[in-house]
């Protein structure tokens, strides 16, 4: 598998300079897609123009709360999120990997989704990992572009709870410590019973 990271330096051993150029082009495309999808100030019209053309008919979206499939379902869901919520995204790392033969690949984006629903009070930072599985198709002009077949959004309920003012302190300082001690005690008892 050939890879590139946000540093722009290849991490694999590309056999041709064209591979690295393709990976860097894909990296920029997925950076743009992420920033469009995860900035709710972007109007639905722009999503239709700049995101939808990169979605396969069978595209699926999965996060810890929901799963949906189909380009039209994805398009309506993205537009709905942009209407109902307020957030943006800070990208910390972005990596594109191509499978052998360069017909498909995966982009992984690591960052923070800044939930701004109550921005006058608090911007909620939610560590998020995005995974885009894609195939590559040739355009009539000979260029290659990705078609996203699966978009998965991953974040931790623990991180979500820890970021809530007040509740986060109780969760982090009391519950997590208490659970850790309880788990270690249960482990010791289990080991003692099995000996």
Description of each model-found segment:
Residues 83-88, 114-125, 157-166:
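Short, cysteine-centered beta-strand-loop-beta hairpins and adjacent loop/turn segments enriched
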């Amino acid at each position: 598998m050939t890879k590139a990271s946000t540093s722009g330096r290849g991490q694999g051993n590309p056999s041709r300079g064209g591979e690295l150029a393709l990976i860097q082009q894909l990296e920029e495309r997925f950076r743009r897609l992420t920033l469009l999808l995860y900035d709710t100030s972007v109007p639905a019209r722009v999503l239709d123009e700049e995101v939808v053309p990169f979605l396969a008919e069978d595209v699926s979206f999965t996060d810890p709360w929901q799963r949906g499939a189909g380009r039209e379902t994805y398009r309506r869901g993205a537009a709905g999120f942009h209407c109902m919520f307020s957030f943006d995204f800070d990208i910390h790392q972005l990596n594109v990997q191509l499978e052998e033969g360069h017909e498909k690949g995966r982009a992984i984006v690591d960052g923070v989704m800044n939930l701004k629903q109550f921005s006058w009070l608090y911007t909620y930072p939610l560590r998020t990992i995005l995974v885009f599985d894609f195939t590559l198709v040739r355009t009539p002009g000979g260029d290659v572009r990705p078609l996203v077949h699966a978009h998965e959004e991953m974040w931790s309920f623990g991180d979500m709870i820890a970021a809530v003012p007040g509740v986060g302190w109780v969760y982090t300082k009391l519950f997590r410590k208490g659970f850790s001690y309880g788990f270690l005690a249960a482990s010791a008892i289990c080991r003692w019973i099995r000996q």
